[in-house]
Amino acid sequence: MAREKFERVKPHVNIGTIGHVDHGKTTLTAAITMALASVSGKKGKKYDDIDSAPEEKARGITINTAHVEYETETRHYAHVDCPGHADYVKNMITGAAQMDGAILVVSGADGPMPQTKEHLLLAKQVGVPSIVVFLNKEDQVDDEELLELVELEIREMLDTYDFPGDSTPIIKGSALMALQALMETDEMSRGSNPWVDKILTLMDNVDEYIPTPERETDKPFLMAVEDVFSITGRGTVATGRVERGGVKIGDVVEIVGLRETRSTTVTGLEMFQKMLQESIAGDNVGMLLRGIQKADIQRGMVVAQPGSITPHVSFDAQVYILTKEEGGRHTPFFKGYRPQFYVRTTDVTGKIESLKSDEDNTEMRMVVPGDRVTMSVELVQPIAIEKGMRFAIREGGRTVGAGVVSNVVS
């Protein structure tokens, strides 16, 4: 069956749902796709299509970041349904690093929970620029005052993590009630169901409040590999988000990081099961690569314009060490500390070889949470690194630092 072509008409925005497990993120994602499809007369994705990996079906929990697409009148969205369980924070980091904005889902019946805060902190750390809040399960709360208290609590929490609590849109509704109404009918216009209207109001706010991102289309092409699979008879496909630049079918690219750099040719491009001739910054794309076996390429590598980026094991970086209140370490650490460095879609263990004060460049014996330091790092595996690149430092399930590469050594 021939694939249809992807038509680029509206600006493309990457968005995601974040929040505590079972607060209704996946239900909301399904309600959004179905509501927008129903208003425009197309077909939306049902809940079961979004919770797509087999292990999620068994647990009813979203594990790997599911990608869905939908359109409002003004934009085309790629939607990442972010996992809500603590052990999947790693996925959230790679999923969230690709978000231009997020919808924070909070159950009106429970209010903010520990993971709500953890996801907000992560959103701050990985640089999600804007957040809109959906106060879900409104149908389960009889007392209007209770909902107002939850809303106040959410605004205070947003302020704590440096998001504008006062001006952030908070939309009340029930994803489940909207979804049930949408299941009963294929086409629905605005005004025909109050629960569906609340979902459409949410998306109006997302359209207005989350800015259209500036894409780096004029820089050399780079895509961090998120996933790899083989298509029988066609070859190996690498998927990921194009970070910068653009790529066309027939272009020669390099696969960089973790192993020897390899050169290959792009023989096919797809986005949401549609064919592309060219892919640009911001696209979530599948790329067919000539002569590459599934074993040759893995998550954490990058596909890039030849010569534009090289693999390295050692670099200097300016790093902020998070305080206990920000979710970081409670205790200091010393030279020789070996945490995980999260860069794009990969995490690699690295040893901190030296520590210097950010203020006067003097050697530091010990680093305390809250410090800003310059550190030299030696990674156990080479990955694609460049000056100005951001990364997170994590250990034992918590983010301990956030940094920027200041110098590439070797």
UniProtKB/Swiss-Prot annotation:
Binding site for GTP: 19-26, 81-85, 136-139
A Pfam family this chain is assigned to: GTP_EFTU
Transmembrane annotation, as ranges: none
Protein localization: Plastid, Chloroplast stroma
Positions of the UniProt region annotated as G5: 174-176
GO terms, molecular function: GTP binding; GTPase activity; translation elongation factor activity
Keyword Phosphoprotein: no
Statement: the UniProt record of this protein carries the keyword Plastid: yes
GO cellular component annotations of the record: chloroplast stroma; mitochondrion
Ranges where the record places region G4: 136-139
Alphabetical keyword list: Chloroplast, Elongation factor, GTP-binding, Hydrolase, Magnesium, Metal-binding, Nucleotide-binding, Plastid, Protein biosynthesis
Region (G2): 60-64
Domain of life: Eukaryota
InterPro entries: EF-Tu_GTP-bd, EF-Tu_GTPase, EFTu-like_2, EFTU_2, G_TR_CS, P-loop_NTPase, Small_GTP-bd, T_Tr_GTP-bd_dom
Swiss-Prot/TrEMBL GO biological process terms: mitochondrial translational elongation
Stored HAMAP family: EF_Tu_B (MF_00118_B)
Function text: GTP hydrolase that promotes the GTP-dependent binding of aminoacyl-tRNA to the A-site of ribosomes during protein biosynthesis.
Protein name: Elongation factor Tu, chloroplastic
Organism, scientific name: Bigelowiella natans (Pedinomonas minutissima)
Species classification: Eukaryota, Sar, Rhizaria, Cercozoa, Chlorarachniophyceae
